[in-house]
Amino acid sequence: MNAGHTETVRALRIGVAGCADIALRRMLPAFAASPHTEPTAVASRSSEKARAAAETFGCAAVEGYDALLERRDVDAVYIPLPVALHAPWTERALRAGKHVLAEKPLTARAADTARLLDLARERGLVLAENYLFVHHSAYTAVRDLVDAGAIGDVRALSASFTIPPRSADDIRYRADLDGGALLDIGVYPLRLASLLLGSELRVRGAVLRHDTVRGVDLGGSALLGDPGTGVSAQLVFGMEHAYTAGWRLLGSEGSLTLDRAYSPPAGHRPVLRIERPDGTEERILPAHDQATAAVAAFAEAVRRAGQGAGQDKGRSSGDAAAVLRQAELVDAVRQAAHLVKI
């Protein structure tokens, strides 16, 4: 390369498999706005839905997901389908040679997650799970404060994510689509616990409120602990509650508290409360579009995979380990749970 020459990197061409709300409201706008990605096609079982989305974002409309995977102008596929469809369509996309960004949770079971991660690694492809909040700059601020000893030694986390009931036909109430509060909502505080407390957490107990008519859990709680340090996490989640979306991290010398912790609007400025014996401080953090940040991280992972960086040219071993660990925690909550039938 000649001195002064700047290499042009082609934008990652994205195909979107489905017209879910999060795709239309957050991810397609982020793909379109990012200099790193370009939405090239939107697929739906309904040609009408596909056309409407495609017209909005200036890309091709495709009827059916198989047709999307056959397109040569698609480098990577974003999958916002119901949870039960994540594993089969992720596998098909990987076998078609596409990188995959799948909505959380990647699958409903750890065994399926492990199998897909292995497939991605074998083929040198990126397989990512779309927890947007982990890309928000607020968590960089939190880590910096904890590392600086702002609250002393970390002792415990309490976190909740709860929402009011949805309409009766909402897919969260469909057992055949792997609905339920744990997979749709509880996964957020579980992922948060690993993010803030590390990868050694174990599930020590859980309760799930199980709707026997619809066959899904409507809410629950879980207790996690690190067997080496004794650090613990108390998590509450559900979809029959008043809205909450916050957490408190307790240390030996103070605490940190954050509300609207999982899905803040792009323009929202988070308020991080720092409580110590000498007083309370509220820091107003910068607004940050976590969807745009997630898209940039995915595009960078694909770029690095193309250059041969990371384990076996695919998703780095650390990222894959975090995805698998999350799936194992979800399985462990199910296995440990006392079911309250309602």
Swiss-Prot record:
GO biological process annotation, one example: antibiotic biosynthetic process
Binding site for NADP(+): 19-25, 44-45, 65, 81, 86, 172, 184
Pfam annotation, one family: GFO_IDH_MocA_C3
UniProt KW keywords: Antibiotic biosynthesis, NADP, Oxidoreductase
Positions contributing to substrate binding: 26, 243, 263
EC number(s) from the headed UniProt entry: 1.1.1.384
Family from the record: Belongs to the Gfo/Idh/MocA family.
Organism: Streptomyces violaceoruber
One MF term in the entry's GO annotations: oxidoreductase activity
Function: Involved in the biosynthesis of the 2,6-deoxysugar, dTDP-L-rhodinose, attached to the benzoisochromane quinone chromophore to produce the aglycone antibiotics granaticin and granaticin B. NADPH is the better reductant, however NADH can also be used.
Listed name of the protein: dTDP-3,4-didehydro-2,6-dideoxy-alpha-D-glucose 3-reductase
Pathway where it operates: Antibiotic biosynthesis; granaticin biosynthesis
Record keyword Oxidoreductase present: yes
Gene3D superfamilies on file: Dihydrodipicolinate Reductase, domain 2, NAD(P)-binding Rossmann-like Domain
